[in-house]
Amino acid sequence: MDKERILTPAVVFSVALLHLAIVALLWQAHKLPVIESGNVIEFVDLGDFGGGGGAPEGAGAPAAPEPQPAPDPPKPVEPPKPVLKPAVTKKADADIQQPKEKPKPEEKPKPEPEPEAKPAPKPAEKPAEKPSEKPAEHSGNASAKAGSEQGNGEGKGTGTKGDGTGRGEGSGKGSGGAKGEHGEGAGGSGGGTGVGSSKGNPLRANGSIPRPAYPALSMENDEQGMVVLSVLVSPGGHVESVKVVKSSGFSRLDNAARKAAQNGHFQANAWTEFKVPVKFELN
């Protein structure tokens, strides 16, 4: 195909040159000679135009012939123009392959998150049972039938109350003689009962504080709302920490409520977490 494309213009150009050469030869063969025209000078004798002999003027010499106009040169024959035929070239079909779409990988379904196991609620601590006073067993001497009195022995256990949980039991034994002697008893001691608390596991209670001062900018901007605080109090009433459980939507009101709770005083004999609502309202 490339060789045919190169030879076709060369052949057309060669044929055109041959036609031009033939036309030039024909033109030279039929070319007519050009007649050169010029000025003709004639000498005329003035005596011939009349004079002393009485002859009329102009009778002595014949009139000069009028010059004939030169014939028009023949028009040159225009050679036929060579007709150039457009070279037809065949275009090879481009071997273009459209890229095939790759199949999209199927999305695997995401595994649903397993629900977190909630810790089982702690059972409420039951107050320890108070130590029951058990009457001491009494025994008499079966062989002493003559004694009218029997001896009884008793024992009691005592304990003091304190923080924490515990159980204490007291027991006593007594023996009686035939003569009605008093028995001897011994009492046991044990811990008291009570509900314990710590900083990590404080008691829960509701509390309140006096209404704090309304921030000036909040009053100008007409800010209102309720703040719920979580106040951790140590034994003795000292405030350990203050957290905002529910915000009012305005930071100035939240900070005012937190500051008032931090400077407040609560009554607590154990670690206690108070839930304190503070309401800001413009009258």
UniProtKB/Swiss-Prot annotation:
Residues 90-137 have a biased composition (Basic and acidic residues). GO terms for biological process: protein transport; siderophore transport; transmembrane transport. Residues 199-283 form the TonB C-terminal domain. It is a single-pass membrane protein. InterPro entries: TonB, TonB-dependent_transducer, TonB/TolA_C, TonB_C. The accessory proteins ExbB and ExbD seem to form a complex with TonB. Belongs to the TonB family. Residues 64-83 have a biased composition (Pro residues). GO terms for cellular component: outer membrane-bounded periplasmic space; plasma membrane protein complex. Gene3D superfamilies: 3.30.1150.10. The lineage of its organism: Bacteria, Pseudomonadati, Pseudomonadota, Betaproteobacteria, Neisseriales. This is Protein TonB. It comes from Neisseria gonorrhoeae. It is found in: Cell inner membrane. PROSITE patterns: TONB_CTD. Keywords: Cell inner membrane, Cell membrane, Membrane, Protein transport, Signal-anchor, Transmembrane, Transmembrane helix, Transport.
